[in-house]
């Protein structure tokens, strides 16, 4: 008879940002453990609130499945003597499998042992598994408490472990499991008996705990939208904020608060940021899209004394907005252009000067990038001015207090200073994209400023030997690299980043004898990120390996070639790979110096020379035209001629001059085919 398992870990308040990952881990870990134990089940559900992690496994079998295995032993000629008696080899093999010699079977000239392992009761499997679920979870930060060696994301206060109605003994950090949980910290009972897994969700709901995070999220969203509609307003919606609030409450109740209209004189960002990022409030806008002097938030509790909670939230926000108003008024006393001197007081990175130094590097790097990509003159003028002002908002009180507003306030202040909208937008766009899925810069100047700022950050950090390893990436270099690549993938710039990296190293005064190693490290870092981008698009590994074997490719070329390679189905062309590999084996150590056409004697070698020259011209023309389908098609056109050449011509001729010339010919054909990369990667 199938059973249901309930396992709840009760703890001090768990950080909201940790919860989705923890619940995902818990489910995956339980699935793995049960599958490894061959214990069938119907479904696994995980639940989470600030104070608890819960797992419910439905339809758990009474015992694990019986396991039948067939083990191959030595050959029958070794296992038995001429009279058919078992030898030591057979006896030892049988003993090792827990069988008698008589249980062995002979098949295809070998002996086999067939064993069966009885199923293990589910209670025994679960008893061993549950402590492993606790210790198997990984957290961004763990903690110890008391004088215990145990560690967890937060101190564990209670455990519930039930297989149907039977308590499964589990101990962790001196806490013993039972069938008693706790309700809402202020509204529910301190001790609540859980009968079984089926009653868990409803029993907690009776004690002001909505343990199902999906139902809780849906309720919060409905409450917020209903309340906004009642105010004839719309919410400045944020899914991430909803997710955070969802894991901050066990019994959600939405409320609406307000603030004085005078604060609306501040830039919208100066109001929205304190609301969302600091207080976890949802701003409201009217039918005209303009901010209203109201906000929505969610209380972890009932509507009892809701007006007191509302007043408290209003008071806290008012203090935040007073700060913002003060900083804004102080900041406006000095335009951005007059704040450049302040950049000398802000350190960029240890040993790499200050932000004034960085600004000078960006001005020069922007000119290099502009030349490489053929930036329009108007955009170049915008880029120059935006770069001069790019970091000046970091000296303002507003950005010092609300660091999330870097670039945002730069744009606001630039507009108030009378700078052009294009300059202001580029100042904002330098930080895009700020996170996965964020918008990319849309203006030409903004794209360039974003790229060169990130390149300077990456090369500077690498030059200090601070290369990200494992999960450690304190300077967010992976995110910045992916940002650069996504900007380039979405642009029309067909440029290589290598000249930009080299210029950056020069501007950072990297020693000449260190530059090649640093360049290789940075390019490898970018290549891996680009590979991951293509893997996320489900591009096959071998196609990516072919593509990225060509270090000279621009990101735009890589994008075009990926699409062309997939459309061409080049990875299915076995003859192409074979011909390419054969040439590689012949000329991998041969340096190309040129083919002497006067030494070509055989028709097949003359034909190959003509075909290779023609293919080379076609490839170059296709590259220049951006016709990636034509570029990808070129290597296959050489295959019949190459095969005929190898069939009719002896490359390693006795005449050294002819031999050397034929190797040069093969090298030429190989080079033409390699224009898209190392085709042998398609093996």
Tell where the protein language model's regions lie, with residue ranges.
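Amphipathic alpha-helical "coupling" segments that flank catalytic cores
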Residues: 1-683
């Amino acid at each position: 008879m199938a059973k249901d398992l309930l396992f709840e870990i009760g703890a001090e308040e768990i950080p909201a940002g940790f919860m989705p990952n923890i619940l995902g881990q818990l489910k995956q870990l339980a699935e793995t453990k049960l599958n490894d134990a061959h214990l069938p089940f119907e479904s696994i559900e995980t639940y989470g609130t600030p104070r608890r992690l819960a797992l419910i496994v439905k339809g758990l079998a009474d015992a694990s499945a019986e396991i039948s295995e067939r083990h191959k032993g030595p050959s029958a000629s070794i296992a038995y003597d001429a009279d058919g008696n078992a030898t030591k080899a057979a006896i030892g093999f049988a003993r090792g499998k827990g069988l008698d010699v008589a249980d062995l079977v002979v098949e295809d000239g070998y002996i086999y042992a067939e064993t069966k392992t009885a199923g293990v009761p589910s209670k025994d499997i679960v008893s061993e598994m549950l402590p492993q679920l606790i210790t198997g979870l990984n957290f961004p930060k763990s903690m110890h408490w008391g004088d215990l060696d145990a560690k967890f994301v937060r101190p564990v206060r209670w455990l519930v472990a039930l297989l149907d109605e039977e308590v499964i003994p589990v101990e962790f950090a001196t806490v013993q499991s039972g069938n008693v949980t706790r309700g809402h910290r202020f509204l529910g009972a301190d001790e609540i008996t859980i009968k079984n897994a089926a009653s868990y969700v409803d029993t907690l709901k009776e004690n002001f705990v909505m343990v199902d995070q999906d139902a809780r999220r849906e309720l919060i969203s409905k409450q917020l939208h209903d309340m906004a509609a009642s105010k004839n307003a719309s919410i400045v919606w944020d899914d991430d904020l909803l997710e955070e609030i969802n894991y901050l409450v066990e019994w959600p109740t939405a409320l609406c608060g307000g603030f004085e209209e005078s604060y609306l004189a501040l830039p919208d960002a100066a109001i929205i940021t304190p609301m969302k990022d600091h207080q976890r409030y949802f701003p409201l806008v009217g039918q005209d899209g303009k901010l209203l002097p109201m906000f929505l938030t969610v209380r972890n509790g009932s509507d009892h004394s809701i007006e007191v909670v509302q007043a408290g939230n209003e008071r806290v926000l008012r203090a935040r907005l007073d700060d913002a108003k003060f900083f804004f008024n102080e900041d406006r006393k000095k335009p951005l252009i007059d704040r450049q001197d302040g950049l000398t007081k802000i350190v960029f990175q240890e040993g790499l000067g200050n932000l004034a130094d960085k600004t000078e590097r960006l001005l020069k790097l922007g000119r290099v990038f502009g030349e490489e990509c053929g930036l329009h003159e108007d955009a170049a003028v915008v880029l120059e001015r935006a770069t001069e002002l790019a970091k000046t908002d970091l000296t303002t009180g507003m950005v010092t207090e609300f660091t999330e507003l870097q670039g945002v306030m730069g744009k606001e202040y630039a507009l108030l200073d009378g700078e052009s909208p294009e300059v202001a937008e580029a100042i904002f766009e330098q930080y895009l994209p700020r996170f996965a899925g964020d918008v990319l810069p849309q203006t030409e100047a903004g794209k360039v400023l974003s790229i060169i700022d990130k390149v300077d950050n990456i090369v500077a950090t690498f030059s200090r030997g601070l290369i990200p390893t494992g999960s450690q990436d304190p300077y967010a270099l992976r995110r910045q690299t992916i940002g650069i690549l996504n900007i380039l993938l979405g642009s029309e710039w067909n440029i290589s980043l290598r000249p930009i990296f080299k210029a950056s190293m020069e501007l950072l005064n990297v020693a000449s004898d260190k530059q090649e190693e640093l360049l290789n490290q940075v390019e490898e870092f970018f290549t891996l990120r680009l590979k991951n981008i293509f893997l996320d698009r489900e591009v096959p590994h071998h196609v990516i390996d072919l593509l990225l074997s060509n270090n000279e490719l621009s990101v735009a070329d890589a994008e075009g070639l990926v699409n062309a390679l997939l459309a061409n189905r080049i990875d299915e062309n076995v003859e192409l790979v074979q011909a390419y590999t054969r040439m590689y084996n012949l000329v991998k150590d041969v340096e190309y110096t040129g083919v002497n056409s006067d030494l070509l004697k055989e028709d097949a070698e003359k034909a190959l020379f003509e075909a290779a020259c023609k293919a080379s011209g076609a490839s170059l023309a296709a590259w220049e035209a951006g016709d990636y389908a034509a570029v990808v098609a070129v290597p296959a056109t050489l295959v019949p001629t190459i095969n005929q050449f190898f069939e009719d011509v002896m490359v390693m001729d006795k005449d050294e001059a002819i031999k050397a010339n034929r190797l040069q010919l093969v090298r030429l054909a190989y080079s033409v085919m390699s224009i898209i990369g190392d085709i042998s990667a398609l093996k």
